[in-house]
Regions:
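A charged, aromatic-enriched C-terminal amphipathic alpha-helix characteristic of glycosyltransferases
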Residues: 96-128
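An anion/phosphate-binding loop that grips the pyrophosphate of nucleotide cofactors and donors
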Residues: 30
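Nucleotide-activated donor-binding/catalytic signature segment of Leloir-type glycosyltransferases, i.e.
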Residues: 1-18
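Short hydrophobic beta-strand element within catalytic cores of glycosyltransferases
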Residues: 55-59, 64
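Short glycine/serine-rich donor-binding loops of glycosyltransferases
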Residues: 43-50
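Aromatic "clamp/platform" in nucleotide-sugar-dependent glycosyltransferases that forms part
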Residues: 19, 38
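A short hydrophobic beta-strand element within the catalytic core of glycosyltransferases
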Residues: 33-34
Length: 128
């Protein structure tokens, strides 16, 4: 990856940050999350970005299930730069969503509910 960044001549525009424990702090510095990916399963980074209240722009190769808030925009990777730029403009036109945490909770992604479910699961394992 670093070689590709160097070969493309964009080293001054790309930061390779490695494994991080402060992802939530990084997300808080962003306005929009882009995922122009060729292949993905269900990327956790998309869920994290939405939980941080970011608008998300995904490639059409990212599963639609990743957009759990239903507020993302999907753009084909073969689309021209103008199409991607228009998606970015649309995100800036939209207000930064303050409802994403509530949307996530409504869809079963509440940290509290998941912690309770995990606790119950472990309690059942101990009893058995």
């Amino acid at each position: 990856m670093e070689q590709a960044v160097h070969d493309e001549g964009v080293t001054s525009s790309v930061l390779m940050l490695g494994v991080r424990e402060d992802i939530n702090e990084l997300y808080s510095m962003l306005d929009t999350f882009f995922m122009p990916s060729l292949y993905e399963g269900l990327p956790v980074s998309c869920v994290e970005a939405q939980a941080a209240g970011l608008h998300c722009v995904y490639s059409t190769d990212v599963p639609r299930e990743s957009d759990i808030t239903g507020t993302g925009i999907f753009v084909d990777l073969t689309a021209d730069y103008g199409t991607w730029s228009n998606a970015l403009e649309e995100m800036y036109i939209r207000d930064r969503s303050t409802q994403n945490p509530e949307l996530l909770a409504l869809r079963g992604y509440s940290a509290k509910e998941n912690a309770e479910a995990l606790t119950q699961y472990y309690e059942r394992l101990v009893i058995e």
